[in-house]
């Protein structure tokens, strides 16, 4: 029998053999008649590759080699892509710029990536992208590290809009419109389907997003700026996350007000100054995990009467 000195033993098992065949799927999004998703690719250094699977289960690679679809925002990262119509927008990890690709129906292929932003490399980061089709622009959370000069300086978070109808793409930050700023952290902007309203979350130091967050709603003017900005459930002492418009005036989100992250709703009436929410699905279990990464969604509205939601019970995730 072969023996060896402890620690110096030459094991046939190494880290490469453990991870070389491991692929994970994340960030699913229904698009056209199929599904967009990210998959880790071990053969390319475990980067995130954007894929598309159509109704015939024909799966195509969207992002080309050399692109890693991932955001560095808040260090933990955020949802790095979105899609609408024929267009896909995503964050590239290597330079933290936003790129776009289009689906070419005539050839059933995807166009080459085109840079949308030119923002000083990874000193400016983006995440939680949303497309505002009514105004032909992209809305995103921007985290700007250019102002950090000392150890006590911090990055600046803003909610920005970037016009897509310009021939001058890519554009720098000077061409972007600031919609909201002043909070230490921002995440998860969601636009109502009619393009009239916007919801997002914000929080301040020393809170983490699982401690205490603000759920902010606002009307969007035809020109694009926000007005009638209000908070749902006030400042409160709860973590509110994953806002999603079911209709133009009804907002669903998750809140741990009861001690568990459960599904709640709010009927928006901007004539009121104190918007309150109510329970949609209450259970003594969490319907999401701590929001380390922004832009996630743990529930899906099936129709006007049904919602599918994930629930963790006895350390196991289940679909309710």
Predicted segment positions?
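Residue-level detector of Asp-centered blade-edge/turn motifs that repeat once per structural unit
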Residues: 30-32, 83-85, 131-134, 193-194, ...
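Hydrophobic or amphipathic alpha-helical targeting/insertion segments
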Residues: 86-103, 109-116, 125-138
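Beta-propeller domains
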Residues: 36-66
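Multi-bladed beta-propeller domains
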Residues: 1-24, 54-76, 101-125, 160-187, ...
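A flexible loop/linker signature enriched in serine peptidases of the S9 family
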Residues: 39-49, 69-75, 90-99, 119-125, ...
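Repeat-blade elements of multi-bladed beta-propeller folds
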Residues: 78-86, 141, 300-301
């Amino acid at each position: 029998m072969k023996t060896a000195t402890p620690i110096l033993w030459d094991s046939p098992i190494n880290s490469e053999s453990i991870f070389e065949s491991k692929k994970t799927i994340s960030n699913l999004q229904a698009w056209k008649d199929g599904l967009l998703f990210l998959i880790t690719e071990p053969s390319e250094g475990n980067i995130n590759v954007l894929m598309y699977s159509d109704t015939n289960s024909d799966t195509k690679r969207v992002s080309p080699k050399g692109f890693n679809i991932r955001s560095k925002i808040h260090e933990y990262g955020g949802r790095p892509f979105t899609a609408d119509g024929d267009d896909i927008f995503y964050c590239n990890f290597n330079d933290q710029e936003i790129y776009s690709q289009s689906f070419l129906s005539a050839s059933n292929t995807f166009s080459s990536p085109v840079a949308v932003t030119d923002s000083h490399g990874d000193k400016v980061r983006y995440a939680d992208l949303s497309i505002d089709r009514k105004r032909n622009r992209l809305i995103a959370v921007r985290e700007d590290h250019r102002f950090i000069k000392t150890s006590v300086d911090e990055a600046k978070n803003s909610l920005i809009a970037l016009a897509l109808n310009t021939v001058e793409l890519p554009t720098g930050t000077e061409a972007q419109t600031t919609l909201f700023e002043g909070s230490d952290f921002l995440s998860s902007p969601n636009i109502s389907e009619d393009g009239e309203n916007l919801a997002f979350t914000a929080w301040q130091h020393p809170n983490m997003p699982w401690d205490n967050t603000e759920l902010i709603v606002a009307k969007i003017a035809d020109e694009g700026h926000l007005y009638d900005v209000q908070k749902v459930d006030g400042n409160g002492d709860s973590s509110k996350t994953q806002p999603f418009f079911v209709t133009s005036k009804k907002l669903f989100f998750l809140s741990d007000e009861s001690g568990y992250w459960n599904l709640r709703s709010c009927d928006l009436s901007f004539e009121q100054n104190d918007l309150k929410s109510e329970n949609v699905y209450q259970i003594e279990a969490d319907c999401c995990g701590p929001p380390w990464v922004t832009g996630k969604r743990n529930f899906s509205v099936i129709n006007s009467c049904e919602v599918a939601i994930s629930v963790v019970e006895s350390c196991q995730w289940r679909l309710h």
